[in-house]
């Protein structure tokens, strides 16, 4: 799907400074001050328009959430949602996932969510997948020991390649489903893509993986 450019998006988000963090490097090691509490921080890498992260924030008010979305023209939809319905436990960043070490200290993030990431199906693009080993190393550097990644996708090949990459990295798998909606957990929060693919009859794959190093 072609991304529609919104030239006004960045200026709009900067006006919402209680939601959008324009320079998150200033908060490295100090996110508890930003949220004004010591609650755990969960991040979603590739938040899209924010259905998942805002849904999670409502369901778990005792957790702080940070939406990571590279594209300003997409992230602005999250900010707009929160202007209409404020959530004190969500912040939005427009940064590249490869730079997460610049914004979070080791152990400052309690969990990472990856939902319906770009599958980058061609072998020559494997390094761009958010479950490639270099990204796994980045997440490990901001998570605590035995930190977790929760991963959902509609793409079986991406799911299988992610299983292999995570296994080769030394991670263990605590929970897995090859058809999440066949027996959907009550606490599952769906993303925009999840709703769309489920309506088409496409199975949703999900796993929870833990670092063991």
From Swiss-Prot:
* CDD domains to which the protein is assigned, alphabetical: AdoMet_MTases (cd02440)
Matching entries from Pfam families are given as:
Methyltransf_4 (PF02390)
Residues the record lists as binding S-adenosyl-L-methionine: 44, 69, 96, 118
Annotated pathway: tRNA modification; N(7)-methylguanine-tRNA biosynthesis
Keywords on this record? Methyltransferase, S-adenosyl-L-methionine, Transferase, tRNA processing
Asked whether the UniProt record includes Transferase among its keywords, one would answer yes
Q: What is its EC number?
A: 2.1.1.33
Family, as annotated = Belongs to the class I-like SAM-binding methyltransferase superfamily. TrmB family.
Question: What is this protein's function per UniProt?
Answer: Catalyzes the formation of N(7)-methylguanine at position 46 (m7G46) in tRNA.
Query: What is the protein name stated in its UniProt record?
Result: tRNA (guanine-N(7)-)-methyltransferase
Which species is this UniProt entry from? Exiguobacterium sibiricum (strain DSM 17290 / CCUG 55495 / CIP 109462 / JCM 13490 / 255-15)
